[in-house]
């Protein structure tokens, strides 16, 4: 379908399932021959396909049984989201790619000066997510920031007040020891948000485009928003400095698009 430029969402569920069966007819025997060629000892007379009726029915039955037993629930949690395939990707399906990136050090102004301090500096590899920041975390053991816990920050560009809070997840040795917290777009931030009752704000839609409500940034892709937000911080005199930073990013095993940690409604076991 991808080679033909056809989206599964455009053709609908029934035609998509038909296409899956067509693919199976075209390639199923080749896959079985490859497995046999590797010397795998299988009962080839009792072959099952993921979408075989008896197999699919068994999965549905187990799902319903677990649901009625209270073992399955629907909730909004962080998932690995592919904005190209528009689907959640399991951890073991994600591929990691090393990337030469940057650490942007951004100045976040305090709502009111504290002991002569007018702002804190946060380090981030993803400045585009700051639109959804709902807090700044510091280590409870970090003497530099203990006096700031409970104070608030006026979030640049967006303008909302967000709290400074203490959480043991924070590594005071990384960056500045102040961590911008975006619960809807980072699994660790999500966990901190749960512990500290932070608001969850999705700033991207299912295609990783900035949603409405963010002025000129709305409608931008992740990369476009990153560039524009960094430029805005620089124009405001709030870009402290930038460092080179190599890190790994998760990509989709199907299309190799960078995955987006995204707050989504899914079924969980």
Map each language-model feature to its residues.
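Short secondary-structure boundary/capping segments
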Residues: 1-3, 89-91, 139-140, 217-220
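N-terminal Rossmann-like or analogous alpha/beta NTP/dinucleotide-binding catalytic cores
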Residues: 1-68, 192, 221-239
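Gly-rich Lys/Arg/Thr-decorated short loops/hinges at beta-loop-alpha junctions or inter-strand turns
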Residues: 8-15, 171-175, 209
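Active-site cavity-forming subdomains of large catalytic enzyme subunits
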Residues: 27, 208, 229, 251-253
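A residue-level signal for conserved active-site and pocket-lining positions in enzyme catalytic cores
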Residues: 31, 153, 256
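NTP-handling and nucleic-acid-processing catalytic cores
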Residues: 37, 41-42, 48, 52-207, ...
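Structured, non-catalytic alpha/beta "coupling" segments that mediate domain-domain communication
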Residues: 127-136, 142, 240-269
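A short-motif feature that recognizes glycine-rich, charge-decorated loops
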Residues: 210-224
């Amino acid at each position: 379908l991808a080679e033909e430029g056809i989206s599964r969402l455009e053709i609908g569920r029934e035609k998509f399932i038909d296409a899956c069966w067509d693919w199976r007819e075209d390639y199923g025997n080749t896959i079985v021959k490859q497995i046999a060629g590797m010397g795998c000892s299988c009962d080839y007379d009792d072959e099952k396909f993921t979408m075989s009726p008896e197999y699919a029915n068994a999965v549905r039955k187990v799902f319903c049984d677990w649901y009625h037993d209270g073992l399955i629930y629907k909730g909004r949690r962080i998932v690995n989201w592919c904005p190209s395939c528009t689907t959640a990707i399991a951890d073991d399906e994600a591929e990691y790619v090393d990337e030469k990136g940057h650490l942007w050090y951004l100045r976040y102004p305090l709502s009111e000066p504290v002991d002569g301090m007018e702002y804190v500096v946060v380090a981030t590899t993803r400045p585009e997510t700051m639109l959804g920041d709902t807090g700044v975390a510091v280590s409870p053991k970090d003497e530099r920031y203990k006096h700031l816990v409970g104070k608030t920050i006026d979030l640049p560009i967006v303008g909302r007040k967000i709290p400074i809070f203490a959480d043991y997840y924070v590594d005071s040795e990384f960056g500045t020891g102040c961590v911008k917290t975006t619960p809807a777009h980072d699994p660790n931030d999500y966990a901190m948000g749960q512990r500290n009752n932070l608001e969850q704000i999705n700033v991207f839609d299912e295609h990783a485009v900035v949603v409405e409500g963010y002025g000129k940034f709305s409608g931008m892709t992740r990369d476009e928003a990153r560039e524009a937000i960094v430029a805005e911080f620089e124009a405001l005199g709030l870009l402290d400095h930038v460092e080179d930073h190599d890190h790994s990013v998760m990509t989709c095993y199907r299309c190799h698009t960078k995955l987006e940690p995204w707050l989504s409604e899914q079924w969980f076991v």
